[in-house]
């Protein structure tokens, strides 16, 4: 091998071994802790070595809520995001705070509870453990995020609204733990509105049965006008915008919601079809002819 090729190989190996800078690491990277006193604890959490976790906290006196230098998240939060069930349980048993949140000046300001609900990776068992050890079922982000225009805006997503997207089981755990079913924030929809956005009619029916306010108003934006004014609508209007193939699972679940509301005095079948929905139906359902279109309009 020539000296030139040998030098190239050495440089390649060295560059391959170079770890990314902390500022380039994502929030689920245990190496965030590498150059901190909690590195051994972090490795034990990653490996789910509960004996070593206990040793690091009880004998080496490493704070169970030690925060990483970038996101200021605790190891409980990191263990939650990476679905380390045994580590989560051990950290909680050692006193880790399930309601501690990460940096709220640069990042979302979310707790382990909210992370467990926002991501699909963490299992329902992890959320159950967090709630068992005092996690707030109404956990709400208190940080910031970047919107579509590149502006920094408040982040106020909360556990129940987030769980609608990730897991029915997590929704049930939160409700059983006392979550406010009608909770909403300045930047996050109430849970039943998220159900309609994400097509989770099954979860919507469950929340309605548990006491969700079906007479509340929802805010819509009139995109056909230049100043995009807002206006209020009822739940029937919102349901009219939920378009599913007739006979599909989502359609059948929607009809259960429709029947529930009918028993409460709200007749979906007498509600007008919002303007613009005919075009949506043509695009999403693609009826073959006018007869199919008319049938769908009558039954959707």
Language-model features and meaning:
Residues 2-9:
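Sec-dependent signal peptide recognition
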Residues 13-16:
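C-terminal motif of bacterial Sec signal peptides marking the signal peptidase cleavage site
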Residues 18-20:
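Bacterial signal peptide processing site
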Residues 31-43, 66-77, 101-118, 140-162, ...:
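Ankyrin-repeat boundary/"N-cap" motif
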Residues 48, 83, 120-122, 166-167, ...:
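Ankyrin-repeat intra-repeat helix-capping/turn positions
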Residues 52, 86-87, 122-126, 169-170, ...:
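Conserved ankyrin/ankyrin-like repeat signature
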Residues 55-63, 89-98, 128-137, 172-181, ...:
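Ankyrin repeat domain, specifically the short helix-to-loop turn at the C-terminus of the second helix
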Residues 245-300:
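Terminal, low-structured helical/coil segments at or just beyond the last alpha-helical repeat
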